[in-house]
UniProtKB/Swiss-Prot annotation:
The keyword Manganese applies. Its EC number is 6.3.2.4. Belongs to the D-alanine--D-alanine ligase family. The lineage of its organism: Bacteria, Pseudomonadati, Pseudomonadota, Gammaproteobacteria, Oceanospirillales. It comes from Chromohalobacter salexigens (strain ATCC BAA-138 / DSM 3043 / CIP 106854 / NCIMB 13768 / 1H11). Residues 114-309 form the ATP-grasp domain. This is D-alanine--D-alanine ligase. Mg(2+) 2 binds at residues 276, 278.
Length: 314
């Protein structure tokens, strides 16, 4: 019998039995299935004892029955990204990828994230919660037009609208209310959109996102072939360093760990404005973290293993 130890053998010993959790019942289920499938295939290629689990099909008891040594969380949105799954895994004593309970809950709440950023002196556009019967004229006076209406607890730009009139604001509020009971309006920042990925202690290269329609919505993120991702992003070296630093500080402000992504706008005066943080970013063929990692010299399989190595308790 050969004593040769292959990379796959070493990976199985190091990581144990890994369950990739994806799917779920949130509005981001479709994207999560794609992310989870890509991660699972990658782990199998790397020789990891990996198994996929659609959380909608068995819940926590089904996951526990698989007896994972670690969980790779690829379930976006509610339950998977908001601290719920993280808390359950901590109660079960199962290590998992990504941020902990509090950071996940904060990252999923756009308004509380912005409150924390403001408390840390970090730049983020002004916003107003649209509660009860909003005073539409007061909202417009506070934020100006155009402005953005967002569900507070959704990702992937689901339910988000850019509005230019009072009537459009009312309609956008109704649309966002289909996805969440908590709705916010935010000052619209005209300019260039950037995203910065974080992996462990490393800040990956920034990506500039260009969309012909001017709005990086769900269709542009996951289905459009006309969305452009610019790497290098076109910023001067010092500007990109400053952008990376503000994104790192934004991630740390909510207590983020492991990996994540921060979305930013740059206005006509060259100022950066933090939009939101993603604690379970997409891992599809259109996703931004894999693109940034590739530009930094990490292929997809290496990236997935790096994320797995940041597992809590490892």
């Amino acid at each position: 019998m050969s004593d040769t130890v292959t990379d796959g053998d070493a990976s199985r010993r190091r990581h144990g039995r890994v369950v990739v959790v994806y799917g779920g019942r949130s509005a981001e289920r479709e994207v999560s299935l794609l992310s989870g499938g890509a991660v699972l295939a990658s782990l199998v290629r790397s020789g990891v004892d990996a198994h996929g689990f659609d959380f909608a099909g068995g819940g926590l008891s089904g996951l526990e029955a698989l007896a994972p040594d670690r969980v790779f969380i690829a379930m976006h949105g509610r339950d998977g990204e908001d601290g719920s799954l993280q808390g359950a895994l901590e109660l079960l004593g199962i290590p998992y990828t990504g941020s902990g309970v509090l950071a996940s809950a904060l990252g999923m709440d756009k308004e509380r994230t912005k409150q924390l950023w403001r408390a840390h002196g970090l730049p983020t556009p002004e916003s107003v919660m649209l509660e009860g019967e909003p005073d539409w004229d007061a909202v417009i006076e506070a934020l100006g037009l155009p402005l953005i209406v967002k569900p507070v607890h959704e990702g992937s730009t689901i339910g988000i609208s850019i509005v230019e009139t009072r009537d459009a604001l009312i309609a956008a509020h109704a649309e966002a209310s289909r996805f969440d009971s908590a709705i916010m309006a935010e000052r619209f920042v005209q300019g260039e959109e950037y995203t910065v990925s974080l992996l462990g202690d490393e800040v990956l290269p920034a990506i500039r996102v260009e969309v012909p329609s001017g709005f990086y919505d769900y269709e542009a993120k996951y289905h459009s072939d006309t969305t452009r991702y610019l790497l290098p992003c076109g910023l001067e070296q010092e500007e990109e360093r400053m952008l990376g630093d503000v994104c790192r500080r934004a991630f740390e402000a909510i207590g983020g760990r492991g990996w994540g992504r921060v979305d930013v706008m740059r206005d006509a005066q060259g100022r950066f404005w933090l939009l939101e943080v993603n604690t379970v970013p997409g891992m599809t063929d259109h996703s931004l973290v894999p693109q940034a990692a590739a530009h930094a010299g990490l292929d997809f399989d290496a990236l997935v293993l790096r994320i797995l190595d940041t597992t809590t308790g490892s």
